[in-house]
A protein has these predicted regions:
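N-terminal alpha-helical modules
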Residues: 1-108
């Protein structure tokens, strides 16, 4: 498999994880529809998280900057961090009613 193909495969994996993350984000937003303050905190947290993800992956791939492998390494980094965020969002959506350690109310 050539580098262009590997770059495309890693990008496709990241895009799939990002799509899942966005689906979960919309579900969390829907649960917070009656709580504007917490919804605002979600938006802020996600914006900061995206900046962190991008900066972290730039840092992690700095040794290969400009090389043909860089896109693959960047996509792999972004995919890994996005999958971790997906797990966080999935756990938020499984909170038990009355769990004060969880920012997302249980499904009604």
């Amino acid at each position: 498999m050539d580098q262009v193909t590997m770059n495309a495969c890693s990008d496709a994996a990241f895009k799939q994880s990002d799509k899942k993350l966005n689906e979960l984000y919309r579900q969390i937003e829907a649960r917070l529809k009656d709580d504007a303050d917490t919804k605002k905190l979600l938006v802020q947290a996600q914006q900061v998280w995206v900046k962190f993800r991008d900066a972290e992956c730039s840092f992690q791939t700095s040794a290969s900057a400009g090389g043909t492998v860089t896109p693959m390494l960047a996509s792999m980094c972004m995919d890994g961090l996005t999958q971790s965020r997906v797990k966080d969002f999935e756990s938020y959506l499984k909170c038990k009613e009355g769990d004060l350690s969880c920012p997302v109310p249980s499904a009604k």
